[in-house]
């Protein structure tokens, strides 16, 4: 068996959530780029280009945003099912608004995907 090369200066904590590590690196640079850029790619106006950069920035901000709005209190208990596995049962007194939570999560996911697609599509335009 071939011995794996050891990579120096890479910490496990930086790789366990690589998406967040990359976002933390890219986000401040994108903000600086937006502030300093005075050029824009062919096919864009300066307003369209800055709007595109804003959507990209928003995607990376949302990746790093751990805050969740209050959707109520999720209460549940566990019961053993007939097949021997434990299952979670939502308590009837739970005030958690599952529909609002799923809508919020879906909206966030759509914005992240849109921004990351714009990032990929315009990666080679990130210069001035």
Stretches found by the model and what they are:
Residues 1-125:
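Long, non-globular targeting/processing and low-complexity regions
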